[in-house]
Amino acid sequence: MDISMNLVILEELYGAERAARLIKDAGFSACDLFIDLDKSESRWHSPDYKKIAADLRATIESQGIKIKQTHAPFRFSANRWDEPDHFKLFVKTLEISSILGAKVCVVHPLHHMEYMGHEEGIYALNVEYYKRLVPYCDQFGIKVGVENMWQRHKIRGTISFDTCSTVPEFVRYIDSVDSEYVVACLDTGHVMLPDNRDKPADFIRALGHDRLKSLHVHDNDYKSDAHWQPYHGKLDWAEIAKALGEIDYEGDFTYEIHDNLIRNLPEALIGDALKYYGAIAKYIVSQIDDNRPK
């Protein structure tokens, strides 16, 4: 199992080559990249985007790091989901991800609308949405990771349930699309933000080996989507590791920690901080391996 982390802020601060070298020196073997096609100034809008992707992959791989996972853009309103030009951005994201060498591209479900009371309509939209992506997954040889979400209550402003934020719905989404190219990406930190009786380990066991192929690993205090490193919040990492081992999880251990855990540090401390984050990941992976079927 590769241990991986989101590289965006490190690349922004230090460039791709040094960013990859920093995480390699910290014990990581892979990284995750955000494909920011939702920004007008994104490099991926260049006519040379294929060469840019190939060159970026070569640069990162030269430091011993693989790009195993990407994240599709998600800052858009629900009423844009079926616009042809908008859908093309997601197809292009899959193409870029494939050139980069990624195995999974995480694509948020459509959830930019009020969820409670509209669950079935949102479900129908999302099943259609993911099924439309399947032929392109096949073309580019990449899987789409469906992520469990949360949202703010329209009136109270408190965190509430959203798409795939319960075990039965998450399982239903994956099974309804029914494609080897559409898998689950469990965001550990999102699970307990709503008043959820199911914990991350329950999601892991329910999704099981065949559905769960990707992770967004981070911690929080159940009050905000803090994206802390493990053991700095309230999640039960021993139970998470146990469950991942029990299902013989074969994906990567991929951090999605907050940019400020990197951005706010003096440059002199970056290397040591990354080694600390790497040590946490290695420890949890060792616990996963200890719980695999014998």
Residue ranges and their predicted role:
Residues 1-6, 68-77:
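N-terminal small/glycine-rich loop or linker at the start of catalytic domains
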Residues 42-50, 79-84, 116, 264-265:
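Metal-dependent catalytic neighborhoods of phosphoester/phosphodiester hydrolases
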Residues 55, 59-62, 78-186, 193-194:
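Active-site acidic/histidine proton-transfer and metal-coordination neighborhood
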Residues 32-33, 67-72, 103-109, 144-148, ...:
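Short beta-strand segments at enzyme active-site cores
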Residues 32-57:
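Glycine-rich, proline-tolerant flexible connector loops at the mouths of alpha/beta enzymes
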Residues 43-47, 84, 159-160, 227-231:
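Short glycine-enriched, charge-decorated loop/helix-capping segments at active-site entrances
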Residues 1-4, 9-29, 61, 87, ...:
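Histidine-acidic metal/acid-base catalytic patches
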Residues 9-11, 35-39, 73-76, 109-113, ...:
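Active-site-proximal loop/turn and secondary-structure-junction residues that shape catalytic pockets
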